A protein has these predicted regions:
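TRNA-recognition modules of translation machinery and tRNA-sensing kinases, especially anticodon-binding
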Residues: 1-327
Length: 327
């Protein structure tokens, strides 16, 4: 509440349509907010396109042919697994509830390590303590077992198992304090609209939920007109829209937002080498913002898309825990 109040008082962020009671998870950037946002965008754009001869920019349209979203799997599978608490009537992402439970286990380990370090002082061997302390080993074993079960449920798209994990871990609703959960259901996140002059002849189109597809469909256009040779990248900054059912945490999770995205195209067999290099490059960029190196960490995905060999998020420690800022 302090951050939200400060952001409004000093002209950074306003609730959109505030004079008409606002619109959930939709915000306007004020006179200072827009300057700050533009500075970050400019810094990112220059780091991507001006410092790399083999990365160029585009600005693709928000509307795209609906077949693109069908082919990419978004129409059928761009979903969040949601669960309701019957007592509080609040809705949550089932996967996030479990991820938060895993994070609590990690925190328990770190607290045990911190206590031991304080007790033993300079003679403390952290690596040995983590490997031999019975309490730490017990927590790690439980965490690893839960992580394995959770990852399998995600990969199998097993909604019943996600709910069972929540029940077995005795996860409670933070509002009501109860464990009275509904079944887990999938909700598609894409906004639909109609394009055409008449209702009968209109085509169903979507507000893009991400900027990547605009890059992919323009790959050949950019490659041919720019005479680009692999490896090369295409970057863009643009609006994206997601019908977030669970929209909380201020501007961290909004229904209309901007993405800064770069897709880097490499030769088959070289993807993991480039993946490792870009991980470190992007982490250095974030740390250069001066917000504190200890505030960042990598988080490997538990569930990979069918086309991916690896996926990692860069997370930042928000007031409400570590959350993804880049992936």
């Amino acid at each position: 509440k302090k951050i939200v109040s400060h952001a409004k008082e000093y002209g950074f962020v306003f609730q959109s349509s505030e004079i008409y009671d606002g619109l959930g998870a939709v915000y306007d950037y004020g006179q200072n907010g827009v300057e700050l946002k533009n500075n970050i965008k400019r810094y990112w754009w220059e780091a991507m396109t001006l410092l790399h001869e083999n990365i160029v920019g585009i600005d693709s349209a928000i509307f795209m042919h609906p077949t693109i979203w069908k082919a990419s799997g978004h129409v059928d599978a761009f979903n969040d697994p949601l669960i309701d608490n019957r007592d509080s009537k609040k809705r949550y992402r089932a996967d996030v509830l479990i991820e938060e439970e895993l994070a609590k286990m990690d925190d328990k380990v770190e607290k045990e390590v911190a206590k031991a370090a304080k007790r033993f002082g300079e003679s403390f061997d952290e690596a040995l303590f983590r490997q031999t302390n019975p309490r730490v080993q017990e927590i790690i074993a439980k965490r690893d077992a839960l992580h394995e079960r959770f990852a399998k449920a995600l990969n199998d798209n097993d909604l019943e198992e996600l709910r069972q994990i929540i029940i077995d871990q005795e996860i409670v609703d933070p509002i009501s304090g109860t464990k009275n959960w509904t079944e887990v259901r999938q909700f598609n996140l894409m906004f639909k609209t109609e394009m055409g002059s008449t209702a009968d002849g209109a085509m169903t189109v979507y507000l893009r939920p991400e900027t990547a597809q605009g890059i992919f469909v323009n790959y050949l256009n950019v490659q041919k007109t720019g005479r680009m040779r692999i490896p090369f990248g295409i970057a863009q900054i643009g609006k994206a829209f997601r019908n977030e059912i669970v929209a909380r945490q201020f501007i961290f999770r909004m229904r209309e937002f901007e993405q800064m995205e770069m897709q880097f195209f490499v030769r088959p067999g070289e993807e993991l080498k480039w993946f490792s290099e870009w991980k470190q490059t992007r982490l250095r960029w974030h740390k250069a913002l001066g917000l504190g190196d200890h505030k960042y960490r990598f988080h490997d995905h538990d569930k990979l898309a069918h086309y991916a060999n690896a996926a990692t998020d860069i997370e930042f420690e928000m007031p409400f825990g570590f959350k993804e800022v880049e992936g």
